[in-house]
């Protein structure tokens, strides 16, 4: 489990306003990050589009970050800020 910075009140409110799927992806990343999009899909059993949208929503409110996977630069790994 990765150590993350505490969430600001503004980030908490923004997260609360997101769809349940984005909150679910956030929780998965909270406990199992870093993960690729494919690994998140496998963990959550959500569709690829739903996970993609959830990751976009989480990036918009600036609570997750990503970088290319070292072994496959076509994929990104996602983790909490």
Residue map of PLM features:
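Linker/hinge segments immediately adjacent to helix-turn-helix/homeobox DNA-binding domains
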Residues: 1-11
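Short, cationic-aromatic polyanion-contact patches
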Residues: 9-22, 36, 67-81
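Hydrophobic residues on short alpha-helical segments
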Residues: 22-29
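Residues within the helices of the helix-turn-helix
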Residues: 27, 38, 56
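Short helix-capping/turn signature of helix-turn-helix
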Residues: 31-32, 46
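Short acidic, hydrophobic short linear motifs in intrinsically disordered regions
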Residues: 34-43
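Short amphipathic alpha-helical interaction segments
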Residues: 47-59
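Glycine-centered, phosphate/nucleic-acid-interacting loop/turn motifs that mediate DNA/RNA or nucleotide
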Residues: 62
